[in-house]
């Protein structure tokens, strides 16, 4: 049977893709997955050099998928120079043989007020760590980091820890969703949702 590409309004298909992700995410949170909110984040420099790492999804809604990091980290520098990214969720325990979700899109920083609110909700020691860590810079010894932690802890003794200016939220605004449902004998099921230049979404079934 041939499945033609389906064209609908941006609102209908985007809402369908987001709802599908939401249902799978809730299923993953109720499963044996250790960190269902862990996602691979792929970025590329302005020169096209790729890199990938695992980050945690902190929020998602109709505006996109949010995570937090330092602007001066490698991913922060990539995203400032080339604000495009891909996300990948892999939940091996779901369905017959696992579920994978890929999301591609442009990236924007969240509003400072939103980042402030999330930072204020974090454990105090995590807030202190955000100030003490020079993320991805060479570290002479574990003792050096412990000394920086103690210094920051003393600096904010008796008062709230504010968000460092360079510690920000990034939102991936989806332009592509792909849902992969694993099956026996590699007869997987793959559905792709993609926005065109005019903002309309297309849904298509892919060969595995």
Swiss-Prot record:
Matching Pfam families: PNP_phzG_C (PF10590), PNPOx_N (PF01243)
Positions contributing to substrate binding: 58, 118, 122, 126, 186-188
Cofactor(s) listed: FMN
The protein's annotated pathway: Cofactor metabolism; pyridoxal 5'-phosphate salvage; pyridoxal 5'-phosphate from pyridoxamine 5'-phosphate: step 1/1; Cofactor metabolism; pyridoxal 5'-phosphate salvage; pyridoxal 5'-phosphate from pyridoxine 5'-phosphate: step 1/1
Annotated FMN binding sites: 53-58, 68-69, 75, 100, 135-136, 180, 190
Record's catalysed reaction(s): pyridoxamine 5'-phosphate + O2 + H2O = pyridoxal 5'-phosphate + H2O2 + NH4(+); pyridoxine 5'-phosphate + O2 = pyridoxal 5'-phosphate + H2O2
SUPFAM superfamilies: FMN-binding split barrel
Keywords (A to Z) from UniProt: Flavoprotein, FMN, Oxidoreductase, Pyridoxine biosynthesis
Single GO MF annotation: FMN binding
Tree of life domain: Bacteria
Similarity comment: Belongs to the pyridoxamine 5'-phosphate oxidase family.
Database matches in HAMAP family: PdxH
Name of this protein: Pyridoxine/pyridoxamine 5'-phosphate oxidase
Organism: Xylella fastidiosa (strain Temecula1 / ATCC 700964)
Gene it is expressed from: pdxH
């Amino acid at each position: 049977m041939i499945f033609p590409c389906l064209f609908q309004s941006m609102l209908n298909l985007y809402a369908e893709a987001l709802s599908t992700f939401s249902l799978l995410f809730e299923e993953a949170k109720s499963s044996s997955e250790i960190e269902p909110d862990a996602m691979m984040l792929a970025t590329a420099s302005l020169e096209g050099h790729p890199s990938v790492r695992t980050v945690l999804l902190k929020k998602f809604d109709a505006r996109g998928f949010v995570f937090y990091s330092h602007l001066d980290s490698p991913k922060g520098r990539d995203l400032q120079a080339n604000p495009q990214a891909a996300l990948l969720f892999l939940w091996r325990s779901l369905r017959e043989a696992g579920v994978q979700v890929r999301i591609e899109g442009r990236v924007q920083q969240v509003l400072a007020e939103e980042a402030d609110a999330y930072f204020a909700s974090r454990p105090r020691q995590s807030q202190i760590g955000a100030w003490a860590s020079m993320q991805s810079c060479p570290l002479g010894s574990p003792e050096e980091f412990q000394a920086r932690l103690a210094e920051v802890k003393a600096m904010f003794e008796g008062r709230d820890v504010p968000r460092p200016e360079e510690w920000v939220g990034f939102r991936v605004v989806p332009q592509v969703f792909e849902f992969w449902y694993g099956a026996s004998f590699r007869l997987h099921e793959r559905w792709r949702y993609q926005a065109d230049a005019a903002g309309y979404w297309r849904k298509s079934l892919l060969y595995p």
